[in-house]
Design a protein with these regions (language model features):
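Conserved small-residue
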Residues: 1-256, 261-311
């Protein structure tokens, strides 16, 4: 939280900003009493940036999106389970002060989980909304704050999802995305090309997809890309979501990257970018323990890096 504040209890309901309520009343079909996703705050200094990926880049919408949405950033949202939240509060690591004071590595409970999702911004364009619904996108009410501090309210379509559970010592990393994403998201190259996933679906995921898609027709355009759960398991070595790790899929491993989550009072957060190719390559195998001498491991939870100093 801003200024390293202690969070309210997990079940505390956040009030919908008045600007969002006012804008929502003008959009056909919006339920102002319903759920709205907060898709980030892009103002300078915000602790809740909704567009930046691990490599510092944003993924843009393009290809078959309407002209008004062309170049709009794909937006991100993160949730954590109550046991994850409670452990953070109990350990007093909700701010940077608590993390810097650690004298031992963290060990989240086996019931801990996090969920990270990516969303295509629709706004109030009903034609684009119908197009995405036809392509099997789950649609939600949402809002975000732009760089100028202005609120934007509308609809958003779910394009990707990481599900992270501590069902094993190394956590279980499961990733899904809509198979029509190449129609609506593009690479950051020149010229921009349709964004595709180069890491899956893996061979193990394909029969799971066939069963799931048959049983759940309304969500049948979503597919499991793959699962990682054990650092001793050789395959899949690479696992990425084209919406969440767009530009570095060839150097993406959920498990190996998050295994580097660590903090040192002398060196701050562990730098998981390897020195090759200008420091934009990330580990695809778990680094040796010797690399973490002087660090306290954060039990794979890199989201703790958002913690702010108490002020």
């Amino acid at each position: 939280l801003s200024k390293g504040q202690a969070p309210q209890p997990y079940s505390t309901q956040a009030n919908l900003p008045s600007q969002v309520q006012t804008q929502a009343q003008k959009i056909p079909g919006m339920n102002t009493s319903g759920l709205f996703l907060n898709l980030g705050n892009d103002t300078d200094g915000s602790t809740d940036n909704g567009t930046q990926q691990v490599d510092g880049l944003a993924l843009e919408m393009g290809n078959q999106v309407p002209e008004a949405q062309r170049g709009q950033s794909v937006r991100f949202h993160m949730l954590m389970g109550q046991d994850t939240f409670n452990y953070i509060v109990q350990q007093k690591i909700y701010n940077r002060n608590g993390i810097a004071a650690l004298t031992s590595s963290l060990n989240f409970p086996a019931t801990a989980w996090e969920l990270k999702t990516s969303w295509l911004w629709i706004g109030s364009d009903s034609t684009f909304q119908a197009q995405l619904a036809k392509d099997g996108y789950f649609i939600a009410q949402a809002y975000y704050v732009d760089k100028q501090g202005q609120y934007h309210t509308g609809y958003a379509g779910l394009s990707g999802m990481h599900v992270i559970n501590k069902l094993t010592h190394d956590w279980v990393w499961t990733t899904f995305e809509n198979r029509n994403n190449s129609k609506y998201t593009v690479t950051n190259g020149t010229p921009a090309k349709p964004m595709t996933n180069i890491t899956g679906p893996t061979d193990a995921a394909q029969p799971v997809n066939a069963t799931f898609q048959q049983q759940n027709p309304t969500l049948a355009q979503y597919e499991l890309i793959g699962v990682q759960y054990d650092q001793a398991q050789a395959e899949p070595k690479l696992l990425a979501n084209s919406q969440l790790e767009s530009a570095f899929q060839s150097h993406s491993s959920c498990l190996a990257c998050h295994n580097t989550a660590a903090y040192s009072s002398n060196n701050t957060y562990f730098n998981f970018a390897l020195k090759e190719d200008g420091g934009i390559v990330y580990p695809t195998t778990v680094l040796p323990d010797s690399d973490f001498v002087g660090y306290q491991k954060l039990d794979y939870v890199w989201s703790l890096k958002r913690a702010q100093w108490q002020r």
